[in-house]
Amino acid sequence: MTELLAVEEINQRISQISDWKLEGNKLKYIKTVKNFVEAINFVNKLVAPAEASQHHPDLEVSYNKVTIILTTHNSGGLTEKDFKMAKTISGLS
């Protein structure tokens, strides 16, 4: 199990990923695109980094929006893995 980050550490790190929001013990990012095809194309870009890190986001896809939620489920909150994945995903945008 990966170690949970302290609240102070979370608050410091969230400032480094300004396009993400902190919601309880999760990170949330909403990507708005032109249409459903672009939404699915964006989701497909997430597959390789998620598989490589063995850290998979929760996803919600609507017509022109992809909502991404990151948390380390087996740890019950936010860990280093979540912030690394958030930075990776932000780089794909």
UniProtKB/Swiss-Prot annotation:
Q: Which reaction does it catalyse?
A: (4aS,6R)-4a-hydroxy-L-erythro-5,6,7,8-tetrahydrobiopterin = (6R)-L-erythro-6,7-dihydrobiopterin + H2O
Keyword list, A-Z:
Lyase
> Which top EC class applies here?
lyase
- Which CDD domains does the entry link to? PCD_DCoH
> Could you give a single Gene Ontology term from the biological process aspect?
tetrahydrobiopterin biosynthetic process
Q: Give the E.C. number(s).
A: 4.2.1.96
GO molecular function terms listed in the Swiss-Prot or TrEMBL record:
4-alpha-hydroxytetrahydrobiopterin dehydratase activity
Specify the domain of life of the species encoding this protein: Bacteria
Record flagged with keyword Lyase = yes
Q: Which family does it belong to?
A: Belongs to the pterin-4-alpha-carbinolamine dehydratase family.
What NCBIfam families does the record point to? Answer: PRK00823.1-2
Q: Which HAMAP family match?
A: Pterin_4_alpha (MF_00434)
Name of the featured protein: Putative pterin-4-alpha-carbinolamine dehydratase
Provide the species name. Answer: Trichodesmium erythraeum (strain IMS101)
